Each structure stands twice: as structure tokens, then as C-alpha cells.
């Protein structure tokens, strides 16, 4: 009988020990799962308790398992976040699920955010490209504008562009400059600081200095001079002055003048063909300077007869009422000392 009781007790102890071992292994697994959610509870403590329970016996093992469960529940209640309490309680019931499933769920919840950001960045990067590419599509009718701009050009301008001779570029550039005419001006002298004297006029609050050369140097003394007209073409910065001209000073009209002068133009091209053109040139001044006359005549010849295009030699002959004459050579600029005022009878132009 004693042997039977000993055998029964040994079997009971064996069953209890196996049950305690399973309980402790489950408790260790639960502690590992809870360590991810609750502030990293150390698992070594549970293992030590399990070893003590195995040696102590089945009753102590069961009590320790119950105590460990009671110890876990307050630790879960002390978690800082309420959302984590709910998730930990549900996960304690499902201890059999592996830890990898939780990592998958975390990865699934975390991955959509960067994908959305990438999609937003791609859309933002593609949208400005469409804005940049759209303007050329809207501006497609530009060739129509270029054809319209080409049509108004006169044949003389096209011929001047194609038949430009390099040696006449400087003359063409000078005689196509803008010119200024001011009437009824007041001129005064300042103390000369160079060998050339200058008359100062102030039209429109700008001071223009006019070099007195040739006949003008003797005609105009210290001044001041009232009721004068000036024809101004700005020269190169020869005297370190920003705005200065040479000659072109005449007296203001005392009466209205409409004087028509005969203008005869004879032109001989490179092939030897000769053409003649006779017209009238209107003079509206009692006194006109050779500077103004030379500049306006050459500008008219450039616009209408392609002067300094493929032809640039010849003469302009100005015949005076008193029988004298002035001859301007077209291959060079009018000399400064010949820019004084005069009275004109007729004009002859020969272009070669």
C-alpha cells in the first residue's frame, strides 16, 4: 500500500511539475510580448522565478504563477498610454500569435505615409514642368508675326542691308544719328578752359555746348546772344563733354519763310547706268547753316537713294545767291570749319 501511495504521489508530482513548466513557459512568453508594449519589463526575473518554482514543488509553482499574473496586471495598468492598455490586454489573450505579425502590422501602418509623400512630391515636380511647356504651345503663331514685320520694309532698306560696304559704315552711322532743332534760344559764353570757345544754350533744362569754329568763331564774341536757332548733332567725346555739338547756329526768323530750292540728283551705279532725278527742297529759314543742310541732305539720300550702301563717293554742290558755291565730298564728313550759316540758291548732287 505504501508503494502504491508513493507511486500515486510521484505521478501527481510529475503531472504538477509538467503543468508548472507549461505555465512558466507561457508566462515567459507573455512577459516577452508585454516587454514590447510596457516599458521593457526584464525577462530574467521571470526565468529565475520559474527555476525556483520547479525546485520548490507543484503547489508553490502554481501559487507563483498566479502571483506573476497578478503582478503583470498592475504593470499593465501603469502604462502611460490608454491605447496601449487596450492593445496589451487583447494581445495577452492571444499569446499564441507570433511577434512577427505585430511587426508586419506596424510596417503596414507606417508604409503608406511615405508613399503619399512621394506621390505628392512627384505631382508637385511634374506640375511646374507642364507650366513651363505650355507657353511655347500658346505662342505658336509667332512665325506669322515675323512675316508681318518683314513685309513693311521698303526695297531701298533691304538693298542697303544686303549691299552694305564696310568702308561706309562710319559715315552711315553718323548721318543716321538723331538731330535736335531749337528755336528762339538764349546763348551765353563762359570762361574758356580749352583752345575752343563754346556757346551754351539751355533748351528743356539741359545744357548743350556748341563749339564755335570757322566763321562762327569770329562772328560770336563774348555775348550773350538772344533769339538764336541751333541745329544740334551730338559729337564724339572729343573735349570731355557729354553733350556738345559743332556749328549750326543761325538767327531766328523775323518772318515766315517757304523757300523752294531745286534739287538735282545724278546717280551712276557700278554697271555704268546713269539716272537723274529733279525735285524741290524746301527751306523754311532766312538763314540756314551748312551743317544742317549737309546733314539733312545726306540723310535723305541714305533713305531714298541708298547712299553709303554700295555707293559712297560723289559730291554735293551748294550754289549761293551771290554766285559762290560750296562743294561737299560724300566720301568724308563735312569739315567743322564749314558749318556756318549761309543763303542758298540751288543744290546739285552727284553720286557715284
UniProtKB/Swiss-Prot annotation:
Secreted protein that plays an essential role in immune innate response inhibition by interacting with and inhibiting host TLR2. In turn, bacteria recognition by immune cells is impaired and cytokine production is inhibited. Mechanistically, by interacting with TLR2, blocks ligand binding and thus inhibits activation. Second, by interacting with an already formed TLR2-lipopeptide complex, prevents TLR heterodimerization and downstream signaling. The interaction with host TLR2 does not involve sialyl Lewis X interactions. Keywords: Secreted, Signal, Virulence. It comes from Staphylococcus aureus (strain Newman). Residues 61-165 are annotated as: Disordered. The C-terminal domain contains a V-shape binding site for sialyl Lewis X. This is Staphylococcal superantigen-like 3. The keyword tRNA processing does not apply. Residues 142-164 have a biased composition (Polar residues). Residues 114-141 have a biased composition (Low complexity). Pfam families: SSL_OB, Stap_Strp_tox_C. Interacts with host TLR2 (via its extracellular domain). GO terms for cellular component: extracellular region. Residues 1-30 form the signal peptide. Belongs to the staphylococcal/streptococcal toxin family. It is found in: Secreted. Residues 228-326 are annotated as: Sialyl Lewis X-binding. Residues 69-104 have a biased composition (Basic and acidic residues).
